[in-house]
Amino acid sequence: MEKDPKERREEEQAPVQNEEACPMGGGEGPKPRENVRGDWDPPAQDFREDMPNGLVNNIDIIDGDADDMERFMEEMRELRRKIRELQLRYSLRILIGDPPHHDHHDEFCLMP
């Protein structure tokens, strides 16, 4: 037998055991925190004094790596220049009609 719609709604809204029934809707939820003015420390001017020695040493190493990075970037620029030059040479050979010369190092001959 079908239950009356009113009875079904009451069953659906029945609170679970050990749970308070709370109305659906606005209700009282958590309130937003208000700005609390308190004492605050301004940011440290020299951040190294607040850091452990290990981190300060790492920063010194990172500063030293700047030279390595500059060297690396210079090598990359040099490689790009060489690649561009080789590509240009190859393109010019194709345009001129001069096929690349094979050195035949990878070929071998079987003698009878």
Curated annotation (Swiss-Prot):
Region His cluster: start-end pairs: 101-105
InterPro entries according to UniProt: BEX (IPR007623), TF_A-like/BEX (IPR021156)
One GO molecular-function entry: metal ion binding
Keywords: Cytoplasm, Metal-binding, Ubl conjugation, Zinc
Localization terms from the record: Cytoplasm
UniProt similarity note: Belongs to the BEX family.
Identification of the protein by name: Protein BEX5
Source species of the chain: Bos taurus (Bovine)
Organism classification: Eukaryota, Metazoa, Chordata, Craniata, Vertebrata
Gene name per UniProt: BEX5
